[in-house]
Amino acid sequence: MSEEQQVQPQLALERIYTKDISFEVPGAQVFTKQWQPELNINLSSAAEKIDPTHFEVSLKVVVQANNDNETAFIVDVTQSGIFLIDNIEEDRLPYILGAYCPNILFPFLREAVNDLVTKGSFPQLLLTPINFDAEFEANMQRAQAAAVEGQA
């Protein structure tokens, strides 16, 4: 066999961990009021190359719950994973880092947020599942449209 035939693509989750976590309840008066929260949820992802075959991919969510115009709680969680990515076509890397890996991390992030909120004595907060594949595709289309617009 030639060397080319022996080289197999590798994609594996080697480690998953909570990189950063915070839960704040600014004031106890929130527990004396009827619970009708307004939620502000911000989610972002990032990827960093650690070495030639490893990437750290992180999902970060910040949830602020306001009740009766007061901050009830703020949750800030960054869930990360170390992924082995080797012998993968370069043009597939953005999809893997921007959609495939976040799809793996999201259930862990969702569980961490819910655990913090319920341990903080609030009703459970289950983040709505996200289709990172669709988000990635939409971002690619926006980038292509912006590039075409910039050339016009």
UniProtKB/Swiss-Prot annotation:
Q: What processes in GO biological process is this protein linked to? A: protein folding; protein tetramerization; protein transport
Keyword set includes Cell membrane: no
| GO molecular function (one) | unfolded protein binding
What GO cellular component term, any one, is given?
Answer: cytoplasm
SUPFAM superfamilies in alphabetical order: SecB-like (SSF54611)
The protein's superkingdom reads Bacteria
Q: Where in the cell is it found?
A: Cytoplasm
Q: Pfam families given for it?
A: SecB
* Keywords from the UniProt entry: Chaperone, Cytoplasm, Protein transport, Translocation, Transport
Assembly behavior: Homotetramer, a dimer of dimers. One homotetramer interacts with 1 SecA dimer.
Task: Report the sequence similarity comment from the record.
Answer: Belongs to the SecB family.
The entry's function note states: One of the proteins required for the normal export of preproteins out of the cell cytoplasm. It is a molecular chaperone that binds to a subset of precursor proteins, maintaining them in a translocation-competent state. It also specifically binds to its receptor SecA.
Per its record, how is this protein called by name?
Protein-export protein SecB
What is the originating organism of this protein?
Acinetobacter baumannii (strain ATCC 17978 / DSM 105126 / CIP 53.77 / LMG 1025 / NCDC KC755 / 5377)
- Gene that this sequence comes from: secB
